[in-house]
Amino acid sequence: MDRLFRGGSQPRRSFLDRLVYAFDVEHAKRTSNFEHLYKQWYQLLKSGQTDNFWLTSLEEEMAGLGVAIAAARREQIAKLNTFIDHEPDDVFPNVKLELDGTVEKMLDNMPALDVEEAYAAKLKSQRRNVLYNDNVDGVNRTDFKVYYKKKRMPAELCSTGEQK
C-alpha cells in the first residue's frame, strides 16, 4: 500500500472502488458493466464500425453507469473525510481525500441527469480519440488523491513513512 500513491491512477482507483464495494454492493456490478461496455465501445470504434445508433446506445448506457459510479465514489470520499476530520491527529493522520475526475467535477455543479447527458455527449465527441490512440476521459480516468494537511502536500510527494 505504501506504493499506492507513487504510481499511476489505476491502482488508486481500484483501491477506492474496493472501499466503495464494502458499503455499496451494487458498485461492483456497475463498474464491471461499465468496463464491459467500454471495451465493447472501444473495439467497435477500433474496428471502424460507424453504426451511430449502436455507438450512441452504448455511450448512453456508459454515461448512466458512469454517473452512478462517480456518485458512489464521491459519497464514500465524503464519508471518509468526515470520519478523518473527527479523529484526533494522533489516531489518524490529518489528510484530505479528493477525486480528480471530469464526471465527479460535473456532479459538483450539475444535477445527475444533466451530467449523464453531458457525459454521453463527451463520449460521443471522443470517438476520434480512440482512432488516434488518445485517452478517453471519464470515470475510467478518475484519480483518487490524498493530501497531507499538516505539510499541505499531495501524498505522492510525502516520504514513504508519511504515506504509511
Predicted feature locations:
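Secondary-structure edge/capping motif, primarily at the C-terminal ends of alpha-helices
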Residues: L45-Q49
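Conserved NTPase motor "head" modules and their coupling/switch loops across ABC/AAA+ ATPases, GTPases
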Residues: F53-K164
